[in-house]
Swiss-Prot record:
Name of this protein: Cytochrome b5 reductase 4
InterPro entries in UniProt: Cbr1-like_FAD-bd_dom (IPR008333), CS_dom (IPR007052), Cyt_B5-like_heme/steroid-bd (IPR001199), Cyt_B5-like_heme/steroid_sf (IPR036400), Cyt_B5_heme-BS (IPR018506), Cytochrome_b5/Flavoprotein_Rdt (IPR051872), FAD-bd_FR_type (IPR017927), FNR_nucleotide-bd (IPR039261)
Organism: Bos taurus (Bovine)
Gene: CYB5R4
Principal localisation: endoplasmic reticulum
Family, similarity comment: Belongs to the flavoprotein pyridine nucleotide cytochrome reductase family.
Amino acid sequence: MLNVPSQSFPGPSSQQRVASGGRSKVPLKQGRSLMDWIRLTKSGKDLTGLKGRLIEVTEEELKKHNKKDDCWICIRGFVYNVSPYMEYHPGGEDELMRAAGSDGTDLFDQVHRWVNYESMLKECLVGRMAMKPALPKDYHEEKKVLNGMLPQSQVTDTLAKEGPSSPSYDWFQTDSLVTIVIYTKQKDINLDSVIVDHRDDSFRAETVIKDYSYLVHVALSHEIQEDFSVLVVENVGKIEIVLKKKENTSWKCLGHPQENHNSFIPKKDTGLFYRKCQLVSKEDVTHDTKLFCLMLPPSTHLEVPVGQHVYLRLPITGTEIVKPYTPVCDSLFSEFKEPVLPNNIYIYFLIKIYPAGFFTPELDQLQIGDYVSVSNPEGNFIISQLQELEDLFLLAAGTGFTPMVKVLNYALTNIPSLRKVKLMFFNKTEDDIIWRSQLEKLAFKDKRFEVEFVLSAPTSEWSGKQGYISPALLSEFLKRRSDTSKVLICLCGPTPFTEQGMKMLHDLNFSKDEIHSFTA
């Protein structure tokens, strides 16, 4: 489906590419880069064929536009004429044609739902699909605001039969506080399960329950202070969000419903939500990799779960470009630092700067105090995989090390059964090794941790392992304590590294349940 053209970052073999999916790319003609596409969209040329009109499109009308020179695609209810984009799409024309004349939302989400198609294709917008309203007509009645019971029409048949129990919410107040209570009916809820944003009068609380998302989204009836608190009662799955009133007056209602309020739908069907975060520091880690520190707004509660990634969004030459990155800790020894503010308001990223890239040079040019939009977390790593684990093996190449940082820290800190954590870290040269001294210090401090560095282009002075990922290296590295010991192997790097590694691990008789590949 729709993809950012070939000059985009991460490149097809980059270890920072999160959602590669193994798709093949088609070489683009000269003059068909992302910059060329942006120039075309800014040229004033009519790319829709409708001379600036927006129309309502029926299913019958959409089906008629299914040819390469007349191709309309629907994404999340909006219809685009992608015919002009055909030659600019690195996945090739055939990939786009899979959704010609139809709703391409599912195909789009399977490959790269993170791409900001609204910005990329805004000059190709034909109009909206003609469809019935998603919410019942009486949805905006005040009783729906006061009582957080989920309307039956919001629960799909599939969800009712197979998904988790439907959550609900309620609220109560004192003279100075308003407390919103979300009843998840799940016991594995914690602080990173809920994301809260308050902007102007808009209040948004999204709770992730397995593969579903429950949303409380209202325009508050009165003003509140910027800061709030979030509490989770884990054994009953109750979330309490405590807001501070600006004035000690009684509220007659919580507020008025906003888009998708009180909905409980598969997470894959939700759009990405962003908030602006401030760049507070940027420091060199290697010759081409930097540690970026972003600060969340005080009106946001967001904790990125272990093994998950977020999307960074920047406006570049008038178009919003989005790229996925996995947050890390600020250090492998964070406990020795004295934070100025609570740790959970900062998000850290190890990012390799590509001088010829499209995104990272712009990111690198940001000044302290500038803003970057950060999305809600995504990812399919399940932290319960680490429970009762005896041996954890980490295979990382380059910046494929980033998802390993939090996994490593969490395992050493929280898994009592853990016997050994071993990291095999592949790089080109010694200068490319991220946090080498920290890794060596950690291995000295905690005897459960071992690290091996493997270089593909070492100097003559290098005495460590050399080469690329191979069956011989892996069979020597991956030693089980016993045939019955519980192990997990995590793998992340450029696409060829990951694909080869997966095949080698299967050939070494490790089961699918014992392997996690960070490719989203």
